[in-house]
Amino acid sequence: MPQRQPQPAHPADGIYFGLMSGTSMDGVDGVAVRFEAGRAPVVLAEAFVGFAQSLRDALFALQQPGDNEIDRESLAANALVTRYAVCCHELQRTAGLSRDEIRAIGVHGQTVRHRPERGYTRQLNNPALLAELTQVDVIADFRSRDVAAGGHGAPLAPAFHATVFGAPGETRVVCNLGGISNITILPGAGGDVRGFDCGPANALIDAWATRHLGKPYDDGGKFAARGTVHAALLAALLDEPYFTAPPPKSTGRDLFNPAWLDAKLAAFSQVAPEDVQATLTALTAVSVAREVAQHAPGCKAVFVCGGGARNPVLLDALRHALREAGVPATVDTTAALGVPPQQVEALAFAWLAYRFTARQPGNLATVTGAAGNRVLGALYPR
């Protein structure tokens, strides 16, 4: 008699892809991961697919209102999804998977507007096209249900962070340094998981490097390391209501963009470019450290993920800012917990796809401010 195949512990168990292109807009990170109920996720493959400068320019242009937006948005979405499909094919090849072995692709899309105070958030995407190009089920549009329930739609990663990084008896902070910085506070003994956006990170650091170096980012923080923090400029940058607003809160390029920076710099025209870069790096560190000091003063360890985890100057600035804020916490990357920092966000969206398939909530209302926990996402069948 033929042997019966072992059944999964949960009907949603299986292999999922997660795709994330963040506010840095340099490319898409992808992971292939196996989820089984009651077990730690197992990463089978990872990939990064960069965006051409023409696509980056189109995405940046859509961050602000302009003419002919519907046409430009649709064309950019199609170009974006072709890169997503390349990433999926690379994951499939690296992991040695057939299409039928992949339960679903969880794809975030590219945020071009985030205005929850007006009741909407917009992630550029064409999940129907991605399903057609990959012949795999696609789960997308994770943020809108939380916004519909009165939440900010962000951050969504804290529920995943709590599942993977939480530790009994130890208060930890997971800090994502992407285009925008955000933190997840994982209480060690009771209490709610909390999380929110702190302010700008690589969005401004990268923009300044592009303007003055002609490079997409400040490689290793070397540009910032050549400069000195300008105290008066730092104070002016921190003089922004968002930094003192209570959570739940979220932000993005709608606020923290080159136009915002230029307005702040108008009174500091004599500050050298490298000093501005050092000050932007300090801005990221100080805005995070102040929030940790206020909301997780007993934190003993901060674990960093996102692109900023590859910037040692930024990590040192964060250590210094935490000491100045009176927080005796160590700073390391999530690699110390077994998850490479470049995988964390893509893993989170694979996990959200897994949660959708199981029809389990993906948000934390205590984080986003929604009326309750909700199942997030929409299915686009293969």
Curated annotation (Swiss-Prot):
CDD domains: ASKHA_NBD_ANMK (cd24050). GO terms for biological process: 1,6-anhydro-N-acetyl-beta-muramic acid catabolic process; amino sugar metabolic process; peptidoglycan turnover. The keyword Disulfide bond does not apply. InterPro entries: Anhydro_N_Ac-Mur_kinase, ATPase_NBD. Pathway: Amino-sugar metabolism; 1,6-anhydro-N-acetylmuramate degradation; Cell wall biogenesis; peptidoglycan recycling. It comes from the Bacteria. Its EC number is 2.7.1.170. One of its GO terms (molecular function) is ATP binding. It catalyses: 1,6-anhydro-N-acetyl-beta-muramate + ATP + H2O = N-acetyl-D-muramate 6-phosphate + ADP + H(+). Keywords: ATP-binding, Carbohydrate metabolism, Kinase, Nucleotide-binding, Transferase. ATP binds at residues 22-29. Pfam families: AnmK. The keyword Transferase applies. Catalyzes the specific phosphorylation of 1,6-anhydro-N-acetylmuramic acid (anhMurNAc) with the simultaneous cleavage of the 1,6-anhydro ring, generating MurNAc-6-P. Is required for the utilization of anhMurNAc either imported from the medium or derived from its own cell wall murein, and thus plays a role in cell wall recycling. Belongs to the anhydro-N-acetylmuramic acid kinase family. NCBIfam families: PRK09585.1-3, PRK09585.1-4. This is Anhydro-N-acetylmuramic acid kinase. It comes from Burkholderia cenocepacia (strain ATCC BAA-245 / DSM 16553 / LMG 16656 / NCTC 13227 / J2315 / CF5610). The lineage of its organism: Bacteria, Pseudomonadati, Pseudomonadota, Betaproteobacteria, Burkholderiales.
